Amino acid sequence: MKNTSSSTTLTMNDTIAAIATPSGKGAISIIKISGHNALNILKQLTKKQDFTPRYAYVRDIFSDGVLLDKALVIYFKAPYSFTGEDVCEIQCHGSPLLAQNILQACLNLGARLAKAGEFSKKAFLNHKMDLSEIEASVQLILCEDESVLNALARQLKGELKIFIEEARSDLLKLLASSEVLIDYSEEDIPSDFLKEVSFNLEKQIASFKDLLDFSNAQKQKNKGHALSIVGKPNAGKSSLLNAMLLEERALVSDIKGTTRDTIEEVIELKGHKVRLIDTAGIRESADKIERLGIEKSLKSLENCDIILGVFDLSKPLEKEDFTIIDALNRAKKPCIVVLNKNDLAPKLELEILKSHLKIPYSILETNTLNSKACLKDLGQKISAFFPKLDTQNKLLLTSLAQKTALENAITELQNAKNHLETLELFSYHLLSAIENLNSLTRPYETSQMLDSMFSEFCLGK
């Protein structure tokens, strides 16, 4: 689409326009316009002059005198809008072609095509939202975890900002007190002051660590727990994977070495995302490709969170089984020992198997011919390894920049506490901690850094 804006300079003073709804057909599409010329563009599109702010109107939409659609239009007068500027929304029928034509009409009338995240950038620069609220709005769009929605909604409401600002205010009071006492000799500094400051710093550090720990745990949950399924060929790994997926995802065959590479699928278990990794059967092989698959299987044990070690209960322990046991011991990960094929006569020496395992483990017997009966037990054993997160009334850090800033603030507060006897150093580290807190909600980034941050947003946002 050609942008016919008379100015090629991309400035925050431009009137911008974009389609705010996802691509594809739907009931409606929304075109947003923001800037000093937004209302004038809407008047020309509708051939109407009277628009009361925050009232919805059904209006015909024209382009060069040609009727395009009958749409719902709303005018938000500055500063009472998302961006803080005049904003107009056009809600048309959900044809992608129609939305593109209306957008082009906006561009023909002087708007510029918005860059990704530019509406949010305007809101940020016009002090309609702080950085923590902007981050929350993006994560809310991307969120796939119901337990996180409440924390994001609270952050969007501004509760993280309030938490940070209250902490910042308390630290500023400590800084002011320490600056007053710098000119005093050490023996003139009240001992009660040092004790109170130390107590307050410990309390602040603990609250920051709680926020950081919860955010890190939630990030791991969002990423998903990696669960590797390992065993010798024909132990029943692929059958177990298929049963857990309730579909034929992995090829099940009596021919050894059928699975030559890792197969990865994602399921949800007890509210947690789990990445199931079916690995190549571990055995000695002259086949170069199969050996590469086996090496990849052993490597997956180093990077996973939980291991399902699958053993054939109907056969005595073999050299390949002991190779797997050694791999489990080296990985030092939580392990569920799955004794498969319990519908056949047991020949596996269970006590020998137990004596060779040097890691925490639990045991589950399964029958791949009727494995659904034990899937519930398997799910409970797997979920027992998941951390129990209390998401009620919790705040959440949603970006690496936020986590880094808080980690730096914690480090500086600890440094300040360690230098309580030297108030100049104490004040220096305390000020550094405050500056790191500032970057969570009121960053001092350059224009280029802001452009980079907001470019990650979607168009129309």
Swiss-Prot record:
EC number in record: 3.6.-.-
Regions crossing the membrane: none
GO cellular-component term (any): cytosol
Chief site of localization: cytoplasm
Compartments where located: Cytoplasm
Binding site for Mg(2+): S238, T259
Molecular function GO labels: GTP binding; GTPase activity; metal ion binding
Gene Ontology BP, a term: tRNA wobble uridine modification
Presence of keyword Magnesium: yes
CDD domains, per database record: trmE, TrmE_N
Cofactors that this protein relies on: K(+)
Residues at which K(+) binds: N234, S253, I255, T258
Domain TrmE-type G: 224-387
Keywords tagged on the record: Cytoplasm, GTP-binding, Hydrolase, Magnesium, Metal-binding, Nucleotide-binding, Potassium, tRNA processing
Binding site for (6S)-5-formyl-5,6,7,8-tetrahydrofolate: K32, E89, K128, K461
Cofactor note: Binds 1 potassium ion per subunit.
Residues bound to GTP: 234-239, 253-259, 278-281
PANTHER family: TRNA MODIFICATION GTPASE GTPBP3 (PTHR42714), TRNA MODIFICATION GTPASE GTPBP3, MITOCHONDRIAL (PTHR42714:SF2)
Similarity-based family: Belongs to the TRAFAC class TrmE-Era-EngA-EngB-Septin-like GTPase superfamily. TrmE GTPase family.
Subunit structure: Homodimer. Heterotetramer of two MnmE and two MnmG subunits.
Protein task: Exhibits a very high intrinsic GTPase hydrolysis rate. Involved in the addition of a carboxymethylaminomethyl (cmnm) group at the wobble position (U34) of certain tRNAs, forming tRNA-cmnm(5)s(2)U34.
Name recorded for this polypeptide: tRNA modification GTPase MnmE
Gene: mnmE
